[in-house]
């Protein structure tokens, strides 16, 4: 196995493959950091700084970017959240073959960071009132993961209304 994040396609289903080198210290440190933050053992500032350090250490670690995006959303800093989410999405999109129209489903744990980053980008765009961008990303996440583990479909109707697409929104909301 290579030391780089990969994306494989089988039967029109895509799956990210974490490198073996990530298992152990890097993932352990990341999980311990999340646990410490969730337990209020470290400050938000410390959490952000440590996530940024991990991102510098391994830029392809999509989940670090996704978690940064979510903490910025919690701080009501949607522009920072969008930038963090887009960094994670750029990593994943770079690996997804051009023209890929298959699924990237939640059931595969290695796909979850990409889907989390995608959902964070949706939320950030909605907060920034970039409704067309939010709609495009909602449609993309629903194409990739029709099970919609994040509940993105519930944002589609309101975002369509905000763009003036009333008929389309009515159809979605019924």
Which sequence ranges carry the predicted segments?
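Short, structured loop/turn "capping" segments at alpha-beta junctions
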Residues: 132-135, 148-151, 166-170
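Canonical tetratricopeptide repeat
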Residues: 65, 118, 152-153, 160
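N-terminal alpha-helical interaction modules that lie
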Residues: 1-104, 112, 118-121, 125-147
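Long, repeat-rich segments with strong aromatic
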Residues: 154-163, 167-174
């Amino acid at each position: 196995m290579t030391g780089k994040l990969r994306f494989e396609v089988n039967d029109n289903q895509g799956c990210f493959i974490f490198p073996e080198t990530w298992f152990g210290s890097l993932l352990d440190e990341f999980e311990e950091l999340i646990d410490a933050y969730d337990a209020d053992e470290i400050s938000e500032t410390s959490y952000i700084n440590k996530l940024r350090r991990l991102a510098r250490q391994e830029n392809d670690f999509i989940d670090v970017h996704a978690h940064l995006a979510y903490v910025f959303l919690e701080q009501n800093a949607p522009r920072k959240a969008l930038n963090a989410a887009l960094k994670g999405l750029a990593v994943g999109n770079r690996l997804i073959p051009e023209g890929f129209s298959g699924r990237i489903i939640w059931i595969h744990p290695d796909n979850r960071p990409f889907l989390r980053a995608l959902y964070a980008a949706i939320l950030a765009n909605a907060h920034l009132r970039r409704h067309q961008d939010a709609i495009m990303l909602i449609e993309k996440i629903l194409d990739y993961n029709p099970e919609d583990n994040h509940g993105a479909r519930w944002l589609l109707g309101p975002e369509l209304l905000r763009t003036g697409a009333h008929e389309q929104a009515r159809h979605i909301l019924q």
